[in-house]
Amino acid sequence: MKKYILIMLMFPLFAFSQKMVSKDVMEVKKFQEDLNAEYLNSKETPLRGDNFTNFKGHPFFPFSPKYKITAKFVKTKSPKPFDLPTSSGKTKSYREYGKATFELDGKPYALTLYQSLDLIKQKKYKDYLFLPFRDLTNEKETYGGGKYMDLTIPKGNTIVLDFNKSYQPFCAYNAYDYNCPIVPEENKLPVEIRAGVMYEDIYHH
């Protein structure tokens, strides 16, 4: 009887967990659909010539809940503006906004989040945070220059990092028309992040 009661108590928790995973899957699916739509739109895509003509959609890693992480967030006090190097040799103005610390497979990691001093002048980007990172899938399953993640300023002391929504910079597909921020040394992760957009090394870069 006690075993039966325990199972009944656990079932709602299991059902809730499954519902949350299903919601996460749908969110990632929408991210993938939106990204593909952007690259298939001639007015928005970074692709040119045959690369655009032949593009059918991005390859993606399978969704994995382990790569949606609730990290501890600490805002940087009195950050100073700095010039972040880009792929073209030019620089863009940023400031460090905070740090996210988390564990993955039992090991601790940290990533720095940045704020674009140009984008925050636009109302729709006032809460936007930029997370560039590299990991051990680069140059194998993902772009050698790393990947990006778009975030918003958290209201508390945690921030959700969903690597399932990470993507390659435009420069991975067209190095001639774009200058993309280079991932800072501090954001190079010594681990494989097998989530988000994969990369087919068929583009001019």
Please identify what each model-predicted range represents.
Residues D50-F55, F60, K77-E96, L113, ...:
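Extracellular/lumen-exposed scaffold segments
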Residues K80-G145:
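Mid-length scaffold segments of soluble, non-membrane domains
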Residues D118-K126, L151-I159, D201:
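Short, surface-exposed linear segments at secondary-structure transitions and domain or protein termini
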Residues F130-Q168:
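Acidic, glycine-rich flexible loop segments
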